[in-house]
Design a protein with these regions (language model features):
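His/Asp/Glu-rich metal-coordinating catalytic cores
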Residues: 1-42, 47-171
C-alpha cells in the first residue's frame, strides 16, 4: 500500500550539552520525500514534544495535509500556527471513540489520561498489521478532568490483535 500517516510532530528542547541551540527538530526527510503518500497527521495531545515541529513540517510540505486532533489540542495547534504565520491549515477535530479512514489505514481514537486534557491514543489498522500508540498517559483513577484511560478500548484492540505497541509515559508523575 502507498499510504502513510504521521503520528505526532514534536520537538525536543536542548539540555545543557547543546549551548546556543533553541530547538531540536526531527528529521522529516523521509516524510518529505514521500509526501504524496501522506494521508494525514494525527496528534495525540497538545504538549510541545508532540506538536512543536508542526509549523516547520507544514512549511516544507508542498500541499495541505489534514491534521487530526481533539478540540483542545487543535486550539493549541491553531495558536502555534498563527505564531508562525501559517494560514488555512486543514485542521480536523476528532473525538475519542471515533474512527477515520486515511487511505488504506484506519485510525481509531481512544481516551487516555495525561497531565493535559484532550489526550488520546490511536489504534492504527493497516494492511501490514495493527499498531497501538498510547500517546502519553498516566494511570490515574481519579483524574481532575474526569477522563480516564479507556481500558475497554485497549481490551478490544488486544482481542483484535496488536502487532506493535508504541507508548510513552512522560510527565506520568504530574
Amino acid at each position: 500500500a502507498n499510504d502513510m500517516v504521521l503520528d505526532d510532530a514534536g520537538l525536543m528542547f536542548p539540555d545543557d550539552n547543546h549551548p546556543g541551540v533553541d530547538l531540536i527538530l526531527p528529521d522529516y526527510s523521509y516524510v518529505l520525500e514521500h509526501a504524496d503518500k501522506l494521508r494525514g497527521i494525527v496528534i495525540t495531545h497538545g504538549h510541545e514534544d508532540h506538536t512543536g515541529s508542526l509549523p516547520y513540517l507544514l512549511k516544507d510540505l508542498d500541499r495541505k495535509v489534514p491534521i487530526y486532533a481533539t478540540k483542545l489540542t487543535l486550539g493549541l495547534i491553531e495558536g502555534k500556527l498563527k505564531e508562525h504565520k501559517i494560514k488555512n491549515a486543514k485542521l480536523c477535530e476528532i473525538k475519542p471513540g471515533q474512527s477515520i479512514k486515511l487511505g488504506c489505514i484506519t485510525a481509531e481514537f481512544f481516551s487516555v489520561n495525561h497531565s493535559i486534557p484532550g489526550a488520546v491514543g490511536v489504534f492504527f489498522r493497516t494492511p501490514a498489521g495493527n499498531v497501538l500508540h498510547t500517546g502519553d498517559f498516566k494511570l490515574d483513577q481519579s483524574p481532575i478532568d474526569g477522563v480516564r484511560t479507556d481500558f475497554a478500548a485497549l481490551s478490544r484492540f488486544s482481542e483484535e490483535g496488536v502487532d506493535s505497541v508504541s507508548y510513552t509515559h512522560l510527565r506520568a508523575h504530574e
